[in-house]
């Protein structure tokens, strides 16, 4: 659908929340996107120089268009761009930072932006803010688990146990040292998932009557620690798996 709407127009991809993602994976993604003919940039939506970082690839992406306009004697105008992304990736935070005032609602839950609006961004750009969009159906269930871990899907529409299990298995395979250090546990690559839950529950003191592990608290803890990047800088979509 988006490919049909965008057509042959220049496309800029902004990888937000780079401070919460694996730096090495971000670099791989930037290189991959460049090879695809896309103009990418990795940013932290709250950083002070955000406008320059976003403006640079946008100007580069539209350079040929404005050169043709100049040859025809057409006065240059502001670049108009539509901002499109999944919910809760920080689009509104970026827009407010660029505009230097609160023009878009923000929140750590999906679906905060409800309407479209044009935002002036410096002297070179005008940005159309749009509500977050998602696929109507996920062909691969793993996509939904990954999106849930970023907060793009509301918690009441997913199985949080499955989300936490996916997160722990991913970290067990790719970030074992960080997982052990953060929760002060001692697991290895062969540890069964239920034993990982038990280890975290014992370490954090999440117990119910009868000294039973409170798995619901462990589940919530793992999910929110992952979303807040407390365990480490994680990237769930690995460039090597493209």
Show where each model-derived region lies.
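Conserved protein kinase catalytic core
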Residues: 22-23, 50, 102, 135-138
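Short coil/loop residues immediately preceding or within conserved phosphate-binding loops
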Residues: 76-78, 101, 116
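Alpha-helical scaffold segments in soluble metabolic enzymes
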Residues: 53, 57, 93, 97, ...
């Amino acid at each position: 659908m988006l490919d049909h709407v965008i057509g042959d127009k220049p496309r800029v991809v902004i990888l937000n929340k780079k401070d919460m993602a694996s730096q090495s994976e971000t670099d791989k993604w930037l290189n991959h996107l460049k090879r695809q003919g896309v103009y990418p940039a990795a940013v932290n939506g709250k950083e002070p120089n955000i406008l320059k970082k976003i403006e640079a690839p946008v100007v580069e992406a539209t350079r040929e268009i404005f050169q043709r306009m100049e040859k025809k004697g057409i006065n240059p105008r502001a670049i108009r761009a539509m901002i499109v992304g999944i919910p809760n990736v920080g689009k509104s935070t970026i827009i407010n930072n660029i505009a230097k005032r609160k023009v878009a609602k923000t929140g750590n839950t999906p679906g905060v932006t409800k309407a479209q609006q044009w935002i002036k961004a410096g002297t070179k750009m005008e940005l159309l803010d749009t509500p977050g969009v998602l696929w109507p159906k996920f062909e691969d269930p793993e996509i939904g688990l990954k999106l849930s871990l970023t907060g793009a899907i509301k918690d009441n529409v997913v199985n949080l146990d499955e989300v936490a299990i996916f997160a722990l298995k991913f970290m067990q395979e790719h970030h074992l040292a960080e997982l052990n250090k953060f929760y002060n546990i001692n697991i290895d690559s062969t540890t069964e998932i239920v034993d990982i839950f038990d280890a975290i529950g014992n370490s954090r003191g999440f117990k119910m009557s009868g000294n039973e592990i409170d798995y619901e608290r462990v589940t919530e803890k793992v999910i929110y620690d992952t979303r807040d990047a407390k365990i480490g800088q994680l990237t769930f979509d690995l460039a090597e798996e493209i």
